[in-house]
C-alpha cells in the first residue's frame, strides 16, 4: 500500500509498504480503508519544522474519513462497510485526567500524525474505542471535517459562556473560521474575525461571519472600537499563532475578560505579564477535543 512519511522537515517520502491484514487484528482493533484526509495547520507547522511536539519520522494525517474493511472479534461499534472517522488521541486511560474523562490532556498523550503515525496511507488500524460511525447521509468530505469542527467546539467551551458577549477571533484559517461560527451559534452578540489575508476573510464572510477585519490594513484597536463602540469585547480566541496577535488581543480586550489560546505557536511569545495581571485577564489553553465536543461536531457537520 501507499504511505506518505514525513522523514524530516520539508522532506516527505512516498513509500510502498505492506498493508495490515485483517487476520492480524486484535479483538478491539478496526482495519480502515482511508478515503479522505484533511491537511491541518499544525501538520504544516510540522512540515516546516516549527511544531514543538512532532517526532520525526512520522506519517501525517489525523483529520480523515474511512470505510471499515474488517473488525476484531470483540468490536461492536462498527462493521465492515461502515463509513467512519476516529479521534486521533492515544491516551493511557489510567492517569488522573483520563479518569476525569479529559483524555485530551492525558499524562501520556500521543497524537497521531505528531507522536504516532497517522492516516496518510491506504489502510490504517485503530482501536475501536476511538471510532465514530458517521451519520447516515454524511459525505466522506464532511466526515473528514469532524475532527477540526470538534477542536473548534471544544475551544469555544473553554471560553466560558459567550451569550451576549462581543467576541474577537484572531486568525481566519479553517479553525478560526469554525471557532467564529461556534461563537456565533453559542449566542455571542457580535463576532469579529481578523486576519492579514483578504482571501481568508472573504471565505469567513461566505460562512456567515459578517464582521471581518484585515489587521494588516487597520489595527485591531481601531477596528474593534469601530464595531463594538464603548462595549469593548469580552472574549477572544487566538488562532493565528503569532506574537503580534496575542499581544494585540491582550491590549485591546476589556478588563477581566478571557482569551483562549487555540493556535500552536512556533516560537514562545513575549508577553507583558504585569499588564495581564493588572487587567485581571484570564488566559485559557485548549487541547483538541473530548467525547462531548466530538459528538457536538457530528451534529454540527450533519446540519451543514
Residue ranges of model-derived segments:
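Residues in the short beta-alpha loop(s) of Rossmann-like NAD(P)-binding domains
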Residues: 197, 265, 289
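Short Gly/Pro-enriched turn/cap motifs at secondary-structure boundaries
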Residues: 7, 20-21, 56-61, 112-116
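NAD(P)H dinucleotide-binding glycine-rich loop of Rossmann-like/cofactor-binding domains
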Residues: 92-170
Amino acid at each position: 500500500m501507499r504511505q506518505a512519511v514525513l522523514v524530516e522537515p520539508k522532506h516527505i517520502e512516498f513509500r510502498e509498504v505492506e498493508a495490515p491484514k485483517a487476520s492480524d487484528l486484535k479483538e478491539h482493533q478496526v482495519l480502515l480503508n482511508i478515503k479522505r484526509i484533511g491537511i491541518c495547520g499544525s501538520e504544516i507547522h510540522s512540515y516546516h519544522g516549527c511544531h514543538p511536539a512532532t517526532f520525526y519520522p512520522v506519517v501525517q494525517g489525523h483529520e480523515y474519513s474511512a470505510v471499515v474493511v474488517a473488525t476484531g472479534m470483540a468490536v461492536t461499534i462498527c462493521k465492515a462497510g461502515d463509513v467512519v472517522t476516529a479521534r486521533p488521541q492515544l491516551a493511557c486511560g489510567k492517569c488522573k485526567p483520563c479518569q476525569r474523562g479529559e483524555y485530551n490532556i492525558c499524562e501520556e498523550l500521543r497524537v497521531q500524525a505528531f507522536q504516532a503515525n497517522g492516516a496518510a496511507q491506504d489502510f490504517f488500524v485503530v482501536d475501536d474505542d476511538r471510532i465514530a460511525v458517521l451519520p447516515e447521509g454524511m459525505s466522506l468530505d464532511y466526515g473528514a471535517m469532524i475532527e477540526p469542527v470538534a477542536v473548534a467546539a471544544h475551544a469555544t467551551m473553554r471560553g466560558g459562556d459567550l451569550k451576549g458577549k462581543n467576541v474577537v477571533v484572531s486568525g481566519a484559517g479553517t479553525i478560526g473560521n469554525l471557532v467564529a461560527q461556534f461563537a456565533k451559534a453559542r449566542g455571542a452578540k457580535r463576532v469579529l474575525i481578523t486576519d492579514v489575508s483578504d482571501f481568508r476573510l472573504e471565505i469567513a464572510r461566505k460562512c456567515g461571519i459578517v464582521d471581518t477585519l484585515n489587521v494588516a490594513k487597520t489595527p485591531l484597536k481601531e477596528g474593534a472600537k469601530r464595531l463594538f463602540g464603548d462595549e469593548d469585547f469580552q472574549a477572544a480566541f487566538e488562532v493565528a499563532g503569532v506574537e503580534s496577535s496575542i499581544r494585540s488581543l491582550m491590549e485591546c480586550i476589556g478588563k477581566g475578560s478571557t482569551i483562549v489560546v487555540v493556535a500552536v505557536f512556533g516560537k514562545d511569545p513575549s508577553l507583558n505579564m504585569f499588564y495581564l495581571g493588572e487587567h485581571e485577564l484570564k488566559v485559557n489553553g485548549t487541547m483538541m477535543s473530548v467525547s462531548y465536543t466530538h459528538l457536538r461536531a457530528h451534529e454540527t457537520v450533519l446540519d451543514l
